[in-house]
Each structure stands twice: as structure tokens, then as C-alpha cells.
Amino acid sequence: DSYYLVKPSYTIANIDRYVNTISNDYGIKNVGFEDIGNTLAGDYNPKARVSREKSMNMQVDKMKSLKESGNLVMTTTGNQYVVPYSDYVTDMDIDSKAVNIIDESVPFYQIAIHGLVNYSGSAINLSEDEKDMILKSADTGAGLYFTFIHQPTSLLQDTDYTQYYACNFINWKDTTI
């Protein structure tokens, strides 16, 4: 899965345009970001250098202004510098399975931020074991998070979106309601 990094100044400049469009055209006051608070990129053009630290500060300033404007903000994975300005953090790491030498884990981070921000782990219907993910969510105080689409998932075959193989709402309706 490849993707391109955009100049930090371009990203920040376009957030206002995006927020204004969804607010004015659709009446939506909430905004969700996948990369703000998750990915830091610098700009190493000698004419307009932006370090990763400056990029982080630009993201924090933008998040502050969105919160002050009354927007609800959702971020993905939520690195610590954006958590104070996020109303909800999705895809937070609530498991330590990435490290093979660990037998048990204590959710220190979740204990520290519990009550400060709402958060969830990865989408339950996209996890390897949905029952285990529900138990881990309860264990860490995380909310339950699902990813749904209305159309049949067969439409996603041979596309860049096959990771959403288990997102058809009709298949999950009885389980989630």
C-alpha cells in the first residue's frame, strides 16, 4: 500500500477549506483526520524548510483552532500531541501483540488518558478475532468501533479497498444492534 506525503503547509492550508466546505455545504461541524496526529512529514525544500517538529506544531495549532471554533475532532491513532484536542481517537493500539517476548500487558496509556478522551481500538469487524477485540476493548476502557458500508463487499474485489471485506452492514446488523 503506497501513499504520498503532502507538504505540511499545503495540508494545513487546505484543512480550513475542507472544514468550511463540509460546514457550509452540508451543515457538518465535526471533522475526522486520518493523518493529522498520526503522520509527521517535513518539507526539505531549501526555500521553505519545515522540520517534523515544526510540522507537529502546525498540526497542534490547527487542532487548537478547530476546537476553539466548536468543531468536534476525531483522529486516528492519536499521537500524544493531538490527544488534548481530540474528542475521539480511533485505531488506538490496545494490544501489545507486536512484541513476541511479552506474555501479558498492562494498559498504562489507556489508564492515563481514560476519561480525558474517548478512544477505541481497531474496527471490531475487521479484526482477526472480534470476540477477543471486544474483550480487549472492555479491558482497556475503549469504545467499540465498527466500519460499515451499505453496498455489497463484492464490489470491492479487485480494487484498492479489499481490506474492507467484512464491512457490509447487513451481515453485522444483528450482532451490533
Where are these regions (language model features)?
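Active-site-proximal substrate-binding groove within the catalytic cores of carbohydrate-active enzymes
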Residues: 2-29, 37-177
